[in-house]
């Protein structure tokens, strides 16, 4: 609840019983409207001048439209056991005859996540004839280091019904994450008998860098580009022995949570565990007895609208742009100790500009049922669909203190 509490502190300065005027005049933005928005010739969509795969928005729209249904009905059954979906647009590619070499920057893949599935999606133009090709996958960071990860052979044929081919790369990424680059590189040398520098030399000599497919076959469509090549990774946060801080809090303030060396990384979804502190009680002899006829004020759920643009997150959050997180309200004079819970909800609430009265919650009138929310946003240059726990209050109730 820490994330939502921090979020609530930034937005409102009065009790929230209705949608704020600032949001009433805003045009609603839906995933469908983004899908219909401007796109490049290669199928990538634009958001604030940044491109993201059309497939990721479709996947997000699928999830929110079937929120109350079994996820196994979705296109990807692995969504049922994943809480993070990362997409990586190819940095570049080369072609030489029937060899394709694809380069991705996979630096943001975290070993603290459990890999569930990985797939390569190549959205091809229509071909006039079939081609048998060998596809090689490399990891590269700023073109300073190129690490061979694996290869496979496939037959590329005319793609009139579906313009995207999907290849299962789960084992390739699993070997990379668990065995390390040394073992992978050795396997490449033994299997191919060709060093990376030899491959690069031959590509340079033939001018193959960023070669358009049209030069290889006159029937190929000339608009094929690296942005049509996407690596999609499905993962799940591993269980940890210690409670974790809110997932969104770790993204924005890594140094605060001891993550200074990985400030630009988000290590997947956090299943937040409460770290309840022992509450010190007053001696029974010094506590005045409560009147028997005392009636507790009503504990109710009221609106608390969150606008990501207003708190400075609009440039990297694609969807949702705003949502109703709700909060619990009851008459009381003792504030809830914000260190008692560390959740996404409490973090969000602490970001909103609530008045002291609105920010304060009765220790006994608290959220008793929360639900998660899927979010679509950028992590550096990568496009991520992530499922954050405890983002929205569903029910309020009294809790003994």
Swiss-Prot record:
The region annotated as signal peptide is: 1-18
Q: In which tissues is it expressed?
A: Expressed in the dorsal marginal region of late blastula, becoming restricted to the Spemann organizer at the early gastrula stage.
The residues that carry sugar chains are: 168, 337, 344
Q: List the disulfide bonds.
A: 299-365, 328-396
Report the locations given in the UniProt record. Answer: Secreted
GO terms for molecular function, please? growth factor activity
The protein's role, per its UniProt record = Exhibits mesoderm-dorsalizing activity and neural-inducing activity, but lacks mesoderm-inducing activity. Regulates the expression of specific mesodermal and neural genes. Induces convergent extension movements at the embryonic midline by activating the fgf signaling pathway to induce t/bra expression in the organizer region. Acts with wnt11 to induce Spemann organizer cells and induce axis formation. The unprocessed protein antagonizes bmp-signaling.
Similarity comment: family membership: Belongs to the TGF-beta family.
**Quaternary structure, from the entry:** Monomer. The propeptide region interacts with bmp4 in a non-covalent manner.
Q: What is known of its domains?
A: The propeptide region is both necessary and sufficient for bmp-inhibitory activity. The propeptide region and the N- and C-terminal thirds of the mature protein are necessary for neural induction activity. Although cleavage doesn't appear essential for activity, residues surrounding the cleavage site are necessary for activity.
Query: What name does the UniProt record give this protein?
Result: Nodal homolog 3-C
Where does this protein come from, organism-wise?
A: Xenopus tropicalis
- Highest classification ranks of the organism: Eukaryota, Metazoa, Chordata, Craniata, Vertebrata
């Amino acid at each position: 609840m820490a994330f939502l509490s921090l979020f609530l502190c930034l937005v409102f300065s009065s009790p929230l019983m209705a949608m704020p005027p600032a949001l009433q005049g805003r045009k609603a933005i839906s995933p469908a409207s983004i899908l219909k928005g401007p796109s490049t010739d290669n199928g990538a969509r634009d958001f604030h001048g940044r491109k993201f795969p059309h497939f990721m928005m479709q996947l997000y729209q699928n999830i929110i439209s079937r929120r109350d249904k079994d996820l196994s009905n979705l296109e990807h059954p692995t969504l049922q056991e994943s809480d993070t979906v990362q997409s990586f647009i190819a940095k570049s590619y080369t072609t030489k005859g029937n060899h394709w070499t694809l380069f991705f920057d996979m630096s943001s893949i975290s070993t603290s996540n459990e890999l569930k599935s990985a797939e390569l999606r190549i959205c091809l133009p229509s071909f006039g004839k079939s081609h048998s090709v060998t596809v090689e996958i490399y990891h590269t960071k700023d073109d300073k280091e190129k690490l061979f990860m694996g290869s496979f052979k496939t037959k590329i044929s005319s793609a009139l019904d579906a313009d995207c081919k999907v290849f299962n790369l789960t084992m390739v990424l699993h070997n990379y994450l668990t065995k390390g680059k040394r073992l992978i590189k050795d396997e490449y040398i033994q299997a191919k008998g060709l060093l990376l520098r030899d491959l690069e030399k031959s590509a340079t000599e033939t001018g193959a860098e960023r070669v358009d497919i049209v030069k290889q076959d006159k029937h190929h469509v000339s608009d094929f580009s690296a942005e049509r090549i996407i690596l999609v990774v499905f993962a799940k946060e591993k269980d940890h022995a210690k409670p974790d801080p809110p997932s969104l809090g770790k993204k924005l303030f890594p140094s605060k949570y001891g993550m200074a060396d990985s400030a630009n990384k988000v290590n997947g979804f956090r299943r937040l565990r409460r770290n309840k502190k022992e509450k010190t009680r007053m001696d029974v002899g010094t506590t005045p007895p409560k009147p028997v006829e005392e009636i507790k004020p009503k504990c109710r759920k009221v609106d608390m609208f969150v606008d990501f643009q207003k708190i400075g997150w609009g440039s990297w959050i694609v969807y949702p742009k705003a949502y109703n997180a709700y909060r619990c309200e009851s008459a009381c004079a003792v504030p809830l100790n914000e260190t008692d819970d560390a959740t996404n909800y409490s973090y969000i609430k602490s970001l909103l500009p609530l008045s002291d009265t609105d920010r304060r919650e009765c220790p006994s009138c608290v959220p008793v049922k929360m639900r998660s929310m899927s979010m679509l946003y950028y992590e550096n240059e990568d496009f991520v669909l992530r499922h954050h726990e405890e983002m929205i209050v569903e029910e309020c109730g009294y809790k003994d203190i």
